[in-house]
A protein has these predicted regions:
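Short, loop-centered acidic/histidine patches that primarily coordinate divalent metals
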Residues: 155-157, 166-169
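Nucleotide phosphate-binding site architecture
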Residues: 29, 40, 171-172, 215
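Conserved alpha/beta core of the MobA/IspD/sugar-nucleotide pyrophosphorylase nucleotidyltransferase superfamily
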Residues: 2-17, 172, 176-219
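Short beta-strand and adjoining strand-loop segment in the mid-core
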Residues: 107-109, 169-174
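Short phosphate-engaging motifs
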Residues: 70-73, 170, 213
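Nucleotide and nucleotide-moiety/phosphate-recognizing core
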Residues: 12-160, 192-199
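Short glycine- and hydrophobic/aromatic-rich loop-to-beta-strand nucleating segment
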Residues: 162-166, 206-208
Length: 219
């Protein structure tokens, strides 16, 4: 499976999935010196709005944005994002635990999606290289995966990337707190569910974790 599958507009029109997305924006940005990643502007656009824009462009049906640390900086951006989505397709949920793990935010976000979604896409907020085409390609890989595949994630060489897309079955397990989702042990245990979708697209790896990462984007 390569990223060319479903990479053009219109390729994903048949057998349409109802997709919910979780945009993770609750972290404390400790390695970045303590900054709200969602409020960082790249080419004049805050990362939170960029992530929501490409999710809107790809046509996801619902989005849950998980905020937490720096809520006061990130939350006002949600008002600007409402123009991208109709009705109640966009919700914000706030992680109440200050010292939380990403798994806690993931569980909160997935639980905020309706039971009507067929699959869930999880996107960290700090991935400025991603485009609409990258997300469409991931959806295509998921739709064209072999029967029994429940999870598709991009893999560049041996490095797992983001975003990932998984089934309602996995979403239910996450909400119920079953297993350490996404860990090496989980991937080994659930290898029959997992498609490590091979691609050479570095967009799936590019994130902003450190000041050096950020410098590479603002210079």
């Amino acid at each position: 499976m390569t990223e060319e599958v479903c990479s053009e507009p219109g390729d994903c029109e048949t057998a349409r999935l109802k997709i919910g997305a979780v945009l993770l924006a609750a972290g404390n940005g400790a390695r970045l010196g303590g900054r709200a990643k969602g409020a960082i502007e790249i080419a004049g656009e805050p990362l939170l709005l960029r992530g929501l824009r490409i999710l809107s462009e790809v046509g996801v049906d619902e989005v849950a944005v998980v905020t937490g640390h720096y809520h006061s900086e990130v939350s006002p951006l949600m008002a600007q994002a409402e123009r991208l989505f109709d009705d109640d397709r966009l919700v914000e949920v706030t992680q109440p635990i200050a010292d939380h793990a990403q798994a806690d935010s993931l569980r909160l976000g997935v639980a905020s999606l309706s039971q009507e979604v067929d699959a869930v896409m999880v996107l960290p907020v700090d991935m400025p290289a991603l485009t609409r085409g990258d997300l469409v390609a991931l959806i295509g890989a998921y739709k064209h995966a072999d029967p029994g595949i429940e999870f598709v994630g991009p893999t560049v060489g041996t490095r797992p990337g983001n975003p990932v897309l998984f089934s309602r079955r996995i979403a239910s397990q996450i909400v119920q707190g079953q297993g350490d989702f996404g860990s090496g042990a989980w991937r080994h245990q659930r290898s029959d569910w997992l498609l490590e979708w091979q691609t050479d697209n570095l967009h799936y790896l590019a994130d902003i974790d450190t000041p050096e990462d950020l410098d590479g984007w603002i210079q």
